Swiss-Prot record:
Traits of the deletion mutant: Accumulates glucose 6-phosphate and fructose 6-phosphate. Has an increased carbon flux through the pentose phosphate pathway, resulting in a higher production of the pigmented antibiotics actinorhodin and undecylprodigiosin.
Residues reported to bind ATP: 10, 72-73, 102-105
Protein's name according to its UniProt entry: ATP-dependent 6-phosphofructokinase 2
SUPFAM superfamilies, A to Z: Phosphofructokinase (SSF53784)
Pathway field: Carbohydrate degradation; glycolysis; D-glyceraldehyde 3-phosphate and glycerone phosphate from D-glucose: step 3/4
Main localization of the protein described in the UniProt heading: cytoplasm
Catalytic activity: beta-D-fructose 6-phosphate + ATP = beta-D-fructose 1,6-bisphosphate + ADP + H(+)
Gene: pfkA2
Main function: Catalyzes the phosphorylation of D-fructose 6-phosphate to fructose 1,6-bisphosphate by ATP, the first committing step of glycolysis.
Enzyme active site: 127
Thermal response of activity: Optimum temperature is 30-50 degrees Celsius.
GO terms for MF: 6-phosphofructokinase activity; ATP binding; diphosphate-fructose-6-phosphate 1-phosphotransferase activity; fructose-6-phosphate binding; metal ion binding
Organism: Streptomyces coelicolor (strain ATCC BAA-471 / A3(2) / M145)
Amino acid sequence: MRIGVLTAGGDCPGLNAVIRSVVHRAVDNYGDEVIGFEDGYAGLLDGRYRALDLNAVSGILARGGTILGSSRLERDRLREACENAGDMIQNFGIDALIPIGGEGTLTAARMLSDAGLPVVGVPKTIDNDISSTDRTFGFDTAVGVATEAMDRLKTTAESHQRVMVVEVMGRHAGWIALESGMAAGAHGICLPERPFDPADLVKMVEERFSRGKKFAVVCVAEGAHPAEGSMDYGKGAIDKFGHERFQGIGTALAFELERRLGKEAKPVILGHVQRGGVPTAYDRVLATRFGWHAVEAAHRGDFGRMTALRGTDVVMVPLAEAVTELKTVPKDRMDEAESVF
């Protein structure tokens, strides 16, 4: 069997662990040939790929990013790929394609599968927002990075009696903000799933200061937004990939809190530091398991599906099921977090 693998969309820790696992399982166990398309679906369309053998994946388990490169594909080019799916199978001689990516990548994978490509998807995203899987690799690392940042910021906030507003990633799902905020003991958490009122945060800070706790840390997801009429804040434009560009809720909220409280409030935007660096042990293991099961699925002819974690088991689920809707933070998880503010 000849297997093609690619990484697309935003990078995250653990991608190389999947690539390594695919190569080891395919080559060692089945004697397969594995090729890696460069820069995601763009490499698939442009015919840019390289052979992946055991030497090519040596030493990459703990490396962040992706040795294959990644990119986002514009919608016109995706349509082009679907229209030429049959030609791509013939030109590259691939018997299976394993795209590793988030919601956008898996949506494209579903379209390519519907067009006739033998596809087995592997979900990744630091946002943990893909339906049908309990966890995605990359998420654990991102939560750890955000938690450590807030742990560090608490000391400087306390020293200067400041309010620190820490903005983390999460356009439409607030999983990183929820879990890192809980782990770091943030005093307020703002999620995309529930509009917030700055007045509640002002009250929280004032109550803390009245008890002699003269600092506060607020964790806010980039997609969080204030309740209508509670503060001035505008949403951003849509980029060419269909993603909303946010205007910086962390900065806007810090300004609003400083204005209302008369106390110094500092925004800290973690940004892409959450995507980089060494993956945690958990993410390495999950990514490795996903790669193993993707190869097994390909050899069973179990196409049009993706790997997923259910409890402690890795199972295969239809791509259509995985991309129907985003997995957002449910009310009970928000209530749990609020109980320890």
